Structures are given as structure tokens and as C-alpha cells.
């Protein structure tokens, strides 16, 4: 069964479940390129890296298991609250701080959090999954087929754009594929299969509880640790249909998310 694409790109259950210059500083990178800049001391993990020694496949698996395990109250951002996916109480031991998924946001939340200057940050821009509750054989391709239409996103740190996503589901060489207009500092990840556990009280609607084989596809930004001080992370999503062939059943979805971070040494 598909989830409502008005609010989610994720699908599952009994059906379907980011002047050229580079200044190298200790543990940080400064990028400048046409139309997109980077704030001082902000680094982005590239697609060829393993953030903190962990593959992107494993990060996707951890993200989905932790995000889906949250009930509606836990997954709802509160005014002035701190919604961190992989830490309901204290995130001090986590190497990467996981921010909320854009598909589940229907108003522009602002969260206020404290994190360490040793922690990286995961911003999921537009992501989906499928699992063995579906009769689809290729779970990764199944997840990929849920991310339809024109998908655009921008990530800013301290008001400075550092990542940009702009892809469009199109007919490419006679078959449907993504036309990439921009994939700057964004990691597109189509994961290997992993084990996904869905609890009875998950905040995701129309799910069948249980443990399944699953796969994920989507676009992420993996930020390297920020320097100590106050920082603001903003990321958004703009999903718009492109036609009955390239985005069947897709409804527009817009979300804007802000995290105000106190980064301690």
C-alpha cells in the first residue's frame, strides 16, 4: 500500500514500504563555486567518503529504523523543541546527528538543539523506502520509483547556501529516469537491502508492524562537524508533479525546516 504522497515519499506495508577555491583547515573545508557558496568551517562529506567509517547504506538503514520507531508525539516537532531522530534524550554519543524527514513536515518548524563540535549532521532532503511487505522483487528500484516529479531542495548553513538539489523524472533514452539539473554537495543513495523493524505505534500511517527486508533511495546532505558556536541550518523541499507519465499519483509537497544549533567544544 502506498502512503499518501501529499505528505510522504516513503512507501511500504502490505503494499509499497546535495571563483573556485578550497582552503583546507583542520577538519574543515571552505568551498566556493559559481552560484553556491559555503560558510566558514562547513564541510560536506562526498559520495566517495564513509562518514565516520560507516557506509551510506548503513546510515540509511540506521536512519529509517530510528525514524520509523518514533511514535506520532516523538516525531512531531514542538515549538522550541529539539527533534533529533537518533536521540530522544541525549545525542552526545552519536557521531552523526539525524535531522527530521521533510516528507512528514506540513508546517515550517524551528528546532533548538545543542550538539558537539565532534558530531556530523544528516539532513534528509527527499527519501523513500520499500520493504518485503510489498510484492516487488527489486526493493531498491521500488523505492526509487516512489520519488517522482520535479524534486528541488536547498540547504543553508548560517544563511549561506551550501547544497542544492534539482532533479526531474523524465523520459531519458526511451525510459523513465532522473534528469539531473543540480546535485551539488548532495548524496544520492540507493541502498542495499537492510533489516527494517516497524513498531505498532509508528508515526508513519498505513504500516504493518513487523521486521522486514527493505531498501532506500533518495537524496541526503551529510555535513561534517561544525565549529563551536551558534549556527543555523535550513533545508527545504519542493516536489511538484510533472505529468501523468512521469509522476503518477504525485501531489505537490513543500516543507521548510530550521535548526538553531548551539555547538559546544
Task: Give the ranges of each region predicted by the language model.
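N-terminal secretory signal peptides that target proteins for export/translocation
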Residues: 1-13
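Extended, well-structured beta-strand/loop surface patches
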Residues: 152-228, 236-264
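Short, hydrophobic alpha-helical membrane anchors of single-pass surface/secreted proteins
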Residues: 14-18
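Bacterial N-terminal signal peptides
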Residues: 19-35
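Extracellular-facing segments of soluble proteins and assemblies that are Gly/Ser/Thr-biased and enriched
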Residues: 95-198
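N-terminal segment immediately downstream of the Sec signal-peptide cleavage site
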Residues: 40-96, 253-255, 261-265
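A short tyrosine-centered beta-strand micro-motif
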Residues: 123, 231-235
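Beta-strand-connecting loops/turns
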Residues: 118, 228-229
Amino acid at each position: 500500500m502506498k502512503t499518501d504522497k501529499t505528505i510522504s515519499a516513503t512507501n511500504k506495508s502490505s503494499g509499497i514500504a546535495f571563483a573556485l577555491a578550497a582552503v583546507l583547515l583542520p577538519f574543515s573545508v571552505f568551498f566556493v563555486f559559481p552560484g553556491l557558496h559555503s560558510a566558514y568551517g562547513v564541510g560536506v562529506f562526498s559520495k566517495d567518503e564513509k562518514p565516520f567509517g560507516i557506509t551510506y547504506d548503513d546510515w540509511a538503514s540506521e536512519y529509517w529504523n530510528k525514524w520509523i520507531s518514533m511514535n506520532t508525539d516523538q516525531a512531531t516537532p514542538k515549538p522550541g523543541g529539539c527533534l533529533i531522530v537518533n536521540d530522544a534524550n541525549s545525542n552526545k554519543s552519536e557521531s552523526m546527528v539525524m535531522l527530521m524527514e521533510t516528507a512528514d513536515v506540513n508546517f515550517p518548524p524551528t528546532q533548538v538543539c545543542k550538539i558537539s563540535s565532534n558530531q556530523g549532521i544528516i539532513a534528509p532532503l527527499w527519501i523513500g523506502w520499500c520493504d518485503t511487505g510489498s510484492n516487488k522483487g527489486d526493493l531498491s528500484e521500488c523505492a526509487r520509483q516512489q520519488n517522482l516529479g520535479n524534486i528541488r531542495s536547498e540547504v543553508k548553513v548560517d544563511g549561506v547556501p551550501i547544497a542544492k538539489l534539482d532533479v526531474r523524472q523524465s523520459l531519458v533514452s526511451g525510459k523513465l529516469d532522473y534528469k539531473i539539473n543540480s546535485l551539488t554537495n548532495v548524496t544520492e543513495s540507493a541502498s542495499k537491502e537492510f533489516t527494517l523493524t516497524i513498531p505498532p505505534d509508528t508515526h508513519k500511517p498505513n504500516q504493518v508492524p513487523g521486521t522486514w527486508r527493505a531498501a532506500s533511495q533518495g537524496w541526503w546532505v551529510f555535513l561534517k562537524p561544525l565549529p563551536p558556536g551558534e549556527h543555523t541550518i535550513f533545508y527545504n523541499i519542493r516536489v511538484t508533479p510533472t505529468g501523468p507519465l512521469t509522476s503518477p499519483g504525485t501531489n505537490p509537497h513543500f516543507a521548510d525546516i530550521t535548526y538553531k544549533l548551539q555547538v559546544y567544544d
